């Protein structure tokens, strides 16, 4: 996937703030899995219609299990950062075009309120036949997020309101393996 960031004008802080009301309208208890993206290698993206979630591997075929983390004790993949999930309305705002959503680097994009008040750590979500659990590890943007979506977007997702709503997304782990499909309901189970 080519990034083509030079062809895209990044939104200003005011333009991003104007999109908050739409993001806040995200469903609270039951939403939709809008997009599945597998990252087979660094910076590579595969858009999938269906995928398997596994206890050890996370999203099967994703490179999470091969990526080290400075946040893990042994420097290996962080077990509480197995899945990166972003609100579909938030990514639609910062990316400006559906073909740019995968550039965010998350594996799952859901139309669901990801705020800490709605999905505190420990909350379980069913997606297809799988169940995942929200973890306490914060999900923050990186230099790639800035280059793809702009400095104002990074400041927006990491602002006070951005952190309250988890606009950059949340981390989760698989607690029951299963199959997921784009269009599946995403339901709070606990």
Where are these regions (language model features)?
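Metal-cofactor-dependent catalytic cores
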Residues: 1-190
């Amino acid at each position: 996937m080519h990034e083509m960031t030079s062809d895209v004008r990044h939104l200003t802080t005011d333009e991003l703030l104007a999109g908050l009301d739409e993001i806040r309208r995200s469903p609270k208890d039951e939403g939709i899995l809008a997009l599945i993206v597998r990252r087979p290698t660094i910076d590579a993206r595969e858009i999938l219609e269906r995928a398997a979630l596994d206890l050890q591997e996370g999203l099967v075929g994703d490179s999470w299990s091969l990526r080290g983390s400075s946040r893990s004790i042994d420097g290996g993949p962080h077990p509480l950062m197995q899945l990166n999930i972003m609100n579909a309305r938030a990514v639609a705002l910062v990316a400006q075009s559906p073909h740019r959503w995968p550039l965010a680097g998350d594996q799952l994009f859901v139309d669901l309120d990801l705020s800490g008040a709605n999905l505190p750590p420990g909350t379980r979500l069913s997606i297809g036949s799988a169940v995942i659990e929200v973890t306490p590890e914060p999900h923050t943007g990186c230099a790639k997020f800035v280059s793809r979506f702009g400095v104002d977007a990074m400041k927006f997702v990491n602002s006070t309101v951005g952190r309250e709503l988890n606009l950059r997304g949340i981390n989760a782990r698989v607690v029951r393996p299963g199959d997921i499909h784009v269009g599946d309901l995403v339901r709070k189970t606990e």
